[in-house]
């Protein structure tokens, strides 16, 4: 519990900091290999559907080249929900999206999603080699109005 509290404080502080050049670069840095991380993509795509209308939202994702498996699964999951994905950041009306997935310790994974200038943090517990989502925290999350 102490670790989660410290992690939340750290995320609060970083969410107030100005954007850096890596803000929209996705990264995937975890040590545990026995876990199926696709749950993170599934959870995010289910969460975001309430705030950004499929078929009316085009995401620009600067994907992580080091973990193609997760990146491809994440992009395909969004496409299956009806979202368009663009590789051209000069197009109009893009919604910029990136993710940073990292391991806090042996029991916790954090997934941070940057959507335009908003941030969503999700902390997952590792229980019996599975990810369990006990909590979603969002800092400065201003969703686009659906419709």
Model-derived features: where do they sit?
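C-terminal motif of bacterial Sec signal peptides marking the signal peptidase cleavage site
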Residues: 12-15
